[in-house]
UniProtKB/Swiss-Prot annotation:
This is Ribosomal RNA small subunit methyltransferase G. One of its GO terms (cellular component) is cytosol. It is found in: Cytoplasm. It comes from Frankia alni (strain DSM 45986 / CECT 9034 / ACN14a). The keyword rRNA processing applies. The lineage of its organism: Bacteria, Bacillati, Actinomycetota, Actinomycetes, Frankiales. The gene is rsmG.
Amino acid sequence: MGPPPAAPAAAAELFGPRLAAAERFTELLATAGVERGLIGPRETDRLWERHVINCGVLAEVVPEGADAVDVGSGAGLPGIPLALARPDVRVVLLEPMERRCRFLQEVVAAVGLEEQVSVLRGRAPDAGIGPEGRRFGVAVARAVAPLERLGAILLPMLQPGGVMLAMRGSRILEELQDARGSLGTQGWHPVDVVVCGEGRVDEPTRVLRAVRSSQLSRAEGRKGRGDGERHDGRQVRRTARDSRRSREVDRDQPTRGQSRST
């Protein structure tokens, strides 16, 4: 386990005056992150491009002044790079595992983000987030769940008109083709794929962008609460059950700036 490589020019362009904080974050990923099992030891040499910059370029598609939640934040990816790249965006790092939350709290303090970023332990239903609690303008997620399930998890966490930004791999268009019908039924419209970071990184970041409909019908709303296909209701019950288990255990490619609607 060694230190990460020096920050590339793309990092200076992306993080600007916060480059030193991004360097500190990357160093923590390479040391404490590896020691605590949040980052694989083989990832150290590619932390900048594969993780930090890869996540930070989400800044290109986050609305100005957004109130965002990073769902299943893990090592702080993508939430912390997003916050570093966008000082105007407030970020909540939502993470169910206590040991990961401790790491995130240490990182937030070490990089000086206490006024912009907060750490919340739990899952959406039992963390005061959702239909009966706080809702966000943006929800970001990286490698959390298949798209159909992810859509069901994130929909009740967002305000009407809120945006889901799901980082996916090279098969994003195939995934979307399979999940398109379910996402529409859940209440996501429009849905498209955007590419972030072109010209900054060798492999740009592919993001599924979906907007929560602001004009759901009553019938659609009931589906979200458990009628019909019951995507939302079923997921809320599942995540609540998973949360209890968690506490017991541990405690295709458009050009830059363009999108492909589906």
